[in-house]
Amino acid sequence: MKVLGLIVEYNPFHQGHLYHINKAKQLIKPDVTIVIMSGHFVQRGEPAISNKWTRAGVAIKNGIDLVIELPFVYSVQSADYFAQGAIELLAKLKVTDIVFGSECGNINIFKDIAFTIKNNQKNYDNLVKKQMNQGLRYPDACNQALSILMNKTVTTPNDLLGLAYVKEVINHNYPIELHCIKRTNDF
């Protein structure tokens, strides 16, 4: 059975979200589609524009079979913790595929970066700490460490979040296939 997992906020739901749902379903052809959605507060700790029940209802009306709330402790955190909570839930739900939107649109780039970090974790962590000790914020320190390790950076919001999803799946060896859809101006 194919079970598609999407990680969303729908704050508010727009045409890009509908595009994401339709494109993901077209790609995976799932038997069931599940979303993990933030509750009354979204990733940056801001209150959602509309309540979680309204947003869940919109998701169901637009082809989602099941909406699961991402616990508050994860939903208001940085990309890494947001991804940790969402991916763990999807793994427990036995999701077979995850599709996310990204600016780069190339899942192999994310996998390459995630495996490089995993295989050089101690060095990467030390580089991040060093950069933070020099005054960089955590996301910037991670990017600088990545630049030193691989001569690559990930700077756009959806690419950062997508990389966090991929790292989480790879680091825990979850049996989940990862896919990304290139974002357009409409998505």
Where in the sequence are the language-model features?
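N-terminal catalytic cores of NTP/NDP-binding nucleotidyl/phosphoryl-transfer enzymes
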Residues: 1-55
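Short beta-strands and strand-loop turn motifs
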Residues: 5-7, 36-37, 68-70, 179-181
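Short, contiguous strand/loop micro-motifs
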Residues: 8, 42-43, 59, 73-74, ...
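Divalent metal-coordination and catalytic microenvironments
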Residues: 14, 59, 166
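Non-catalytic positions within long, well-ordered alpha-helices that form the structural scaffold/packing
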Residues: 25-26, 60, 87-91
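Receiver (REC) domain switch/active-site residues of two-component response regulators
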Residues: 31, 65, 96
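A glycine-rich helix N-cap at a beta->alpha junction
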Residues: 57-71
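Active-site cores that bind ATP or allylic diphosphates and position pyrophosphate for catalysis
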Residues: 69-187
